[in-house]
Structure formats: C-alpha cells, structure tokens
C-alpha cells in the first residue's frame, strides 16, 4: 500500500506541516467544530498524528500507519492500527465518527461509508472534512499531485460525488460548511472564514446522521 508507506516514512514531515501552516490548520479545525458534538463517544478514522482529534475532543482513533499512531498516542489518544473499511469495532459503538482528508486515500469509499454507518449508534453523527476537487485549491492539487509527497496517489472528489456515496450508504439529510477560499499559495483573512453550505471553498465539511 504505497499511501501507507509514504505516511509511515514521513510521519514527522506530515506532523510539522501543521505548525508551518497554522492559519490554514485552525480554519479547518473551526469548520469541523461547527458539526462535531461537544459530548458523546467519538472516533477519528484516519487519525494520523492526532492533530484534529485532540482539539475537537475525540478520544479514539484508528490509522494504518504505526508511526503516525505513535505520535497520536503521545498526544493522549487511545489508538488502534486498522483501516476504515474493516474496523475492529462492534456495531453501534460511537456517537461520532470523524474523517479529515481521508477519503482521497481510500481504495473503496462506498465500502468505507457503509462500515462507518455500522459502528455508529442510531442518530450518531458522521463528520467528513475533505478537499473539494472543484475548488481553486483542489484543481491546483490535482494538477500538481505527481510532484507531491503525500498527494501523489490521492483521488480528489467533488462535493456531489461524496454526497451521493453518503446517501447510498443509508445516512440521513446532509449539512455543509466550508473554508479556504482562493489560494493555493496563500489565504487572506476572508479566505479563512467558515461559511455555511458549499460553493468554492477548498475544505468542505459534510455532516449527517445515522438514521
């Protein structure tokens, strides 16, 4: 699995990115916080080094990369090495499942979403943060991904594609917010705002419930 290998080999480089892009990172956290509940049992699938789970109060995480999980564990998270399509979790365990820039690295997104629904409690929330392929930054990432350490094997999707997969998995109505407008080299203060719905923001957050 080349994607896992990249993150395994460059876990520190990945983690350092957040310190070097603090304003972008905080805008993404703010967008996710719009939908992440303050209470309940949550898990982040593709938790990486824990950069999103920790500020959002998510206690558990899974990831296929052992080295990424080592960093997440040092941040106080309870973690397990696994992939999202085959979660080592009983049915209906969580009030929240969180994914952040994960679906672009998943081989079978529909299978992933069905598995996430399985582990969610009735009325539990699924919150997905992803790069909108149709945004300015998304198009830039797509055109330059062959030269990217992390995005070389990524597949970016439109909001409509992700929404269709979520609906097909059996989830309920969808809500959205977005941030990171413009780019790709820098973002103004206005470009880092969090807005309801979706249009041309690069980072889109989708929220739905397990009905």
Set out the residue ranges of the language-model regions.
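Class I SAM-dependent methyltransferase SAM/SAH-binding core
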Residues: 43-86
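A conserved beta-strand element that flanks and buttresses the S-adenosyl-L-methionine
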Residues: 98
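Short catalytic micro-motifs in class I SAM-dependent methyltransferases
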Residues: 101-104
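A short glycine-rich, Lys/Arg-flanked "PGG" loop and its adjoining helix->strand segment in the class I
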Residues: 110-122
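Short alpha-helix
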Residues: 154-170, 174-176
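C-terminal lobe and adjacent flexible extensions of AdoMet/dcAdoMet transferase-like proteins
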Residues: 202-211
């Amino acid at each position: 699995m080349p994607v896992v290998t990249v993150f395994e080999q460059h876990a520190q480089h990945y983690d350092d990115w957040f310190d070097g892009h603090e304003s972008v990172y905080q805008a993404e956290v703010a967008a996710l916080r719009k939908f992440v509940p303050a209470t309940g049992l949550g898990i982040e699938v593709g938790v990486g080094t824990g950069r999103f789970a920790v500020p959002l109060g998510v206690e558990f995480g899974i990831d296929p990369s052992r080295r990424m999980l080592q960093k997440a564990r040092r941040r106080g998270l309870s973690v397990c090495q696994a992939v999202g399509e085959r979660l080592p979790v009983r049915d209906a365990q969580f009030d929240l499942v969180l994914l952040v820039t994960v679906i672009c690295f998943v081989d079978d997104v529909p299978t992933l979403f069905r598995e996430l629904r399985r582990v969610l409690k009735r009325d539990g929330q699924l919150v997905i943060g992803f790069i909108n392929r149709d945004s300015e930054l998304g198009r830039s990432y797509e055109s330059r991904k062959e030269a990217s350490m992390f995005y070389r094997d990524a597949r970016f999707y439109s909001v409509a594609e992700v929404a269709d997969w979520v609906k097909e998995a059996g989830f309920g109505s969808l809500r959205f917010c977005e941030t990171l407008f413009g780019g790709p080299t820098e973002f103004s203060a206005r470009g880092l705002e969090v807005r309801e719905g979706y249009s041309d923001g690069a980072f889109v957050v989708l929220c739905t419930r397990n009905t």
